[in-house]
Amino acid sequence: MFTTSSRCSSLKRGKKTEGISAYSSSRCSSLPRNGIGNPYHPPTAPTQSESESEVPTHSSVRPSNAMVSLARRPLSAAVPAGNLLGIHLFRCPDAVGIVAKLSECIASRGGNIHSVDVFVPDDKPVFYSRSEFTYNPRLWPRHELHKDFLNLSRCFNAQTSTVRVPDLDPKYNISILASKQDHCLFDLLYRWQEGRLPVHINCVISNHDRPQDNHVRRFLQRHGIPYHYLPTAPANKREKEILELIQGTDFVVLARYMQILSENLLKAYGKDIINIHHGLLPSFKGGNPSRQAFSAGVKLIGATSHFVTPELDAGPIIEQMVERVSHRDTLQSFVVKSENLEKQCLAEAIKSYCELRVLPYELRKTVVF
């Protein structure tokens, strides 16, 4: 059994160990839960796999930087019968032997690592990793799994150490805030209905009223999801009521909610809030970014999903998507193209977050595995 008193065994980067090929590289290949972007709350995430013979060695990069990158394969194909998939997200000061001790922790319980992604920045000795592994829950009960990874985190003074077992752990409980435009909201509801978003929707909150026969209201009623209409005014953003409704959720999604959340609400909530901005940040912040982009004569437009911080449209970016435009495009075609990008971008950011692919990196950045 792994304990905190165990001496952290060493692993020379660039050498192969137990089916994992470690090598030096500053590139980051490519999964998040809990407290990833909120400045008042820390985060989490998972990984992938492939045979060690397919992992190249980059000798030109100095050995202090490391990445273990194993190509993805379908998770269903990677989980033997009777076993479960586990995902581990890790952030700690860089040190020799982290991957070796991670492998030892899992292997000592009969588990098998299927993929590991590691990133160490060029200019900062911080170790980021996401791992996917399979294990037999009869041999490694969930509470023991949690305890072993807690010991691992203590061994390396980790800032983040999150382990998630999707088939055992509850789905993320979320609330969605939206305004008049509902293309992002309805897209999320449709993906949720299709089983493509691993979340439980606690409620939908809007500052725009929708009649009972509205397609969104009918969908919510059919699926038993509460809808709360909270009209806002400059002097009253209804944040007390919003806070009461979102308490108990794991994170909140702003699906084109056209109100600025105060710093007091962010502090009181204390968890991550994911926003979609209909522009390619950091350009075209604030209102009407499509018109700003059209007036600037850009050749690419985009959408940005990011964590909400007190500074408007300045939180760490999770996902961005772009599409080419030309002199033939009109302002209306900019808007139509942007809406398609917004739906995809927001859904992808939520999926990455739920799959433990996101970690905070410096003040305004993220590592997205």
What residues fall within each predicted segment?
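N-terminal mitochondrial targeting presequence
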Residues: F2, R7-C8, R13, A22-Y23, ...
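Short glycine-/aliphatic-rich beta-strand segments at the starts of folded cytosolic domains
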Residues: A81-C92
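One-carbon transfer enzymes
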Residues: F119-F369
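Eukaryotic intrinsically disordered, low-complexity regulatory segments enriched in serine/threonine
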Residues: K12-G14, T44-E50
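Intrinsic-disorder-associated, low-complexity terminal segments enriched in Asp/Asn/His/Tyr and depleted
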Residues: Y23, N38-H41, H58
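Short amphipathic alpha-helix segments
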Residues: A95-S115
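Residue-identity detector for glycine
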Residues: G14, G19, G35-G37
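Low-complexity, intrinsically disordered Ser/Thr/Pro- and acidic-rich segments
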Residues: I36-N38, S49-V55
